Amino acid sequence: MDNNYNDNVNGWAEMEPSQPMGGLRLPTQNMDPPEQNNESQLSELPRMKIDNDYASPIERQSVITSGTNNYEPKVETVTSFFHTGIDYSNFGMLDQTTMQPFYPLYSGIPVNTLGTFSGYTNSIYDKPSLYDPSIPTINIPSTYPTVAPTYECVKCSQSCGAGMKAVNGGMMCVNCSTPKTTYSPPVAYSTSLGQPPILEIPSEQPTAKIAKQSSKKSSSSNRGSNGSASRRQGLVCSNCNGTNTTLWRRNAEGDPVCNACGLYFKLHHIPRPTSMKKEGALQTRKRKSKSGDSSTPSTSRARERKFERASSSTEKAQRSSNRRAGSAKADRELSTAAVAAATATYVSHADLYPVSSAAVTLPDQTYSNYYQWNTAATAGLMMVPNDQNYVYAATNYQTGLRPADNIQVHVMPVQDDETKAAARDLEAVDGDS
């Protein structure tokens, strides 16, 4: 079965092949065009006949109708509205299909009323004029006057001007934000001949702390006059209404109380009952008199201990000086003995070392005729054996020796403990004698 298609085909017909098939004829489609609802807008459809090449009593016919619709152009009037100017001069090198509208900003924006777009074409160069010189324009300034914000100083509550500084919680003016430089008064030094410089502090500054001893003395001297001073001030105990006390205190509320009421509340944590108030003279402790006539046993014992410490320190100093003197004396004696022993002239040792004239025969050589000790010589002595190759003459040997006149004796300091103990014992013996 063959199908033939073409553009804008509204009808088609199928024909049987040339050979009959069972003697049946297929129904054909109605070739008449469909009814149109709007007869005024559609033209009469043209008809075209297509002959088939098959030689068959049943012909195949196709009707092709053009699908063109004829509409009458309508022109409508556009309602007038406002348009702003558009600069088309920059669009000359752009593609019309990809061109985007460009809206430049102007300081003075013209306002114009446009009617219908008569004579408007598709070309970008044939734009209608959007500016009319006869219509007034509205000038909009490019800049607006701005008002500087005002701030209030968080410290002095005044308006902050130029030079203000941002701080935590607000702004601070230049006067409050500028650090104040404080200068301490100079310290005066008085220098006098023969005396060390004394530091003088001006009266504006607080004076230095007083020594502990002077503070104790002043407190002990003023303790007796506390009662009279407190009575002169007119203080009254808020608990017992008493005025005679040696020391004024304050309770938890800050009210003045006497010494008895203050101590009672401190120990028992309850106010002192008024029934415990005693009239008459106050009981005070027995203290040392200022004259010093009456001395307690403790004071005498302290004086004795002080004297003993002084005497013992004196004795220790004396013993140490004696020890140093004895040590120096022992060093001098040791040095003198060492020098004397080193520089003393040798004496005859004939009785100590008897020399025999008998020959001593050895396997390798024979020694005989040893020189005797020279008792008259003032130089050092030496025994020289009788050498078979060279004989030392007695005269040459004696004249060739010189006395030892450059002997230097170095006395080393005592280092070991035993020697030190012996030196101390020697000093003790010298001191006793």
Curated annotation (Swiss-Prot):
Keywords: Activator, Differentiation, DNA-binding, Metal-binding, Nucleus, Transcription, Transcription regulation, Ubl conjugation, Zinc, Zinc-finger
GO cellular component, one term: nucleus
Free-text tissue specificity from the UniProt record: Expressed in the intestine.
Subcellular localization(s) per the UniProt record: Nucleus
Stored Pfam families: GATA
Alphabetized PROSITE patterns for the sequence: GATA_ZN_FINGER_1 (PS00344), GATA_ZN_FINGER_2 (PS50114)
GO molecular function, one term: zinc ion binding
Designated name of the protein: Transcription factor elt-2
Coiled-coil ranges (or none): none
Biased composition (Polar residues): 27-43, 310-324
Residue segments, region Disordered: 1-47, 194-235, 275-332
Domain of life: Eukaryota
Residue spans, zinc finger GATA-type: 237-261
Subunit structure and binding partners: Interacts with lag-1. Interacts with pha-4. Interacts with rpt-6.
Organism: Caenorhabditis elegans
Function of the protein: Transcriptional activator that binds to the consensus sequence 5'-[AT]GATA[AG]-3'. Predominantly directs the transcription of intestinal genes such as ges-1, cpr-6, pho-1, ftn-1, vit-2 and lev-11, and itself. Required for gut-specific differentiation, specifically acting with the GATA region-binding transcription factor elt-7 to control normal gene expression and promote normal formation of the intestine. Regulates intestinal gene expression in response to hypoxia to promote longevity.
Knocked-out gene: effects: Animals do not survive for long beyond hatching and frequently die at the L1 larval stage. Upon attempts to feed, food accumulates behind the pharynx and there is blockage of the brush border that surrounds the gut lumen in surviving L1 stage larvae. RNAi-mediated knockdown results in a reduced body size and reduced gene expression from zinc-activated promoters and of genes related to the immune response. This reduction in target gene expression is enhanced when infected with B.pseudomallei.
Gene Ontology process terms (BP): cell fate commitment; defense response to Gram-negative bacterium; determination of adult lifespan; digestion; endoderm development; innate immune response; negative regulation of transcription by RNA polymerase II; nematode larval development
Biased composition (Low complexity): 211-234
Induction: By P.aeruginosa infection.
Entry PTM: May be ubiquitinated in response to infection by B.pseudomallei.
